[in-house]
């Protein structure tokens, strides 16, 4: 009988080609915690253990819009740490429940303060109760997880040819890590950033509410080098949600709304470049959005 630890199942996700399209997508929703954020949770926690900033008995506190919180709770609890996740109250009930079921503590902040309010509260909790904050928006091990693992997997699975890479911007780690690797291997690759309509930080818009959870937090993350981005595409809530539903119906892919946003944007690039190999990621699962406007 062969068996492995749950953390050994993070990464090495399959690559899916959308039917009758020149778009390939890495199925990150198949990670054990249900999202691409499992990768950075493992990377950041193990780096903190290695450098001694995280030691047995310490607490982990992290501000997040949801998926990073799930990943950190999964990895942190598997390693025996107490985990407290701080998130805006408007995130889906499923995300909140998953964190609690995995054994994490949950602190909610006003939705109109966006992720910035969660960051402020997390900093306050660390100051008052101790522990460490992994700081996904600043942590280089976020980028490293994608540069050293996600990107090489994608490049190999794609047969060493990718003409464009499309990714939404949440913490910035995916587009920075994968984009940097792809530029190194193909200097002509086009890196496409996806942001919610009218609240794009890259375009200088003010923060605002939208329904594409996981991207569009209203600021440019410290770990993102904006010079890496070649194209910025804005997607409406309606297009993101509609594409997410269509992916389930036409490709049997049960993904979240940021996946719909990514695929919608990839299709805009495909219209202009039908001969290109266009890669993207499907960051998380549909089930954590059934209480929102996805159904």
Residue ranges of model-derived segments:
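PLP-dependent amino-acid enzyme catalytic core
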Residues: 1-295
């Amino acid at each position: 009988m062969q068996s492995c630890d749950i953390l050994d199942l993070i990464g090495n996700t399959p690559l899916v080609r959308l039917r009758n399209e020149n778009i390939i997508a890495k199925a990150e929703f198949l990670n054990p915690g249900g999202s691409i954020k499992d990768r950075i949770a493992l990377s950041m926690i193990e780096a903190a253990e290695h450098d001694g900033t995280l030691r047995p008995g310490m607490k982990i506190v992290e501000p997040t819009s949801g998926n990073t919180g799930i990943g950190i709770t999964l990895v942190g609890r598997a390693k025996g740490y107490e985990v407290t996740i701080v998130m805006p109250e408007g995130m889906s009930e499923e995300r909140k429940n998953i964190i609690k079921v995995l054994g994490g503590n949950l602190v909610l902040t006003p939705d109109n303060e966006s992720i910035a309010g969660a960051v402020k509260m997390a900093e306050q909790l660390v100051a008052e109760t101790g522990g460490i904050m992994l700081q996904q928006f600043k942590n280089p091990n976020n980028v490293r997880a994608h540069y050293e693992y996600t990107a090489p997997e994608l490049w190999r699975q794609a047969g060493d040819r990718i003409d464009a890479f499309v990714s939404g911007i949440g913490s910035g780690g995916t587009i920075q890590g994968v984009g940097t690797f792809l530029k190194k291997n193909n200097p002509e690759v086009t890196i496409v950033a996806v942001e919610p309509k009218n609240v794009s930080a890259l375009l200088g818009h003010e923060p605002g509410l939208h329904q594409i959870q996981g991207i569009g937090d209203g600021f440019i993350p410290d770990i993102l080098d904006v010079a890496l981005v070649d194209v910025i595409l804005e997607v409406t809530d309606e297009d993101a949600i509609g594409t997410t539903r269509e992916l389930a119906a036409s490709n049997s892919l049960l993904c979240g709304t940021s996946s719909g946003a990514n695929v919608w944007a990839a299709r805009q690039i495909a219209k202009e470049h039908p001969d290109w190999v266009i890669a993207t990621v499907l960051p998380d699962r549909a089930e954590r959005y059934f209480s929102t406007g996805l159904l």
